[in-house]
Amino acid sequence: MALYNFIVSQSPNPRDFGHETLDLDIGLTKMLQVLQLHAHWGDKSGYGSEHTVDGKSFDAELHIVHFNTKYVFPGEALDKEDGLAVLGIFITVGDQDHPEFEKICKRFTDIENAKEIVQLEDDLNINNLIPGNQTFFTYPGSLTTPPLYESVIWIVFKQEIKISQRQV
């Protein structure tokens, strides 16, 4: 798997993440494949997430973007009502490194230019990025960046994961 300016740049085989599928029963009947992941964070502690829970913001929010495999290419799914599903995972800063998140972080320093691509050295197990309490909210929505297509089923976990200040 490759990181491209801090995001996964290719359509990886789910085996690259350590599992063929993500074992999460969300009531969807479509086949989804991981497309990319990225994070949103702010310049102040507690103000980086795009979603809030009961009015509370979090330090950051990780998005794991999936596309519906009934479309041959991810680009075909972007503007379709059933095209995408995004797992939203809140992040707070804690005292210890998050071992799975570290697999991503340790390659950040190797990206010096906006279009540079680096390979992850270790398989990424997405299940290890999901909070222990798998309570989540789901709703139909849109991409949060242009072109803002209304093609996303959002699955946002209520509980956050913790990463270290160094990993932010």
What kind of region is each of these model predictions?
Residues 1-168:
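Alpha-carbonic anhydrase
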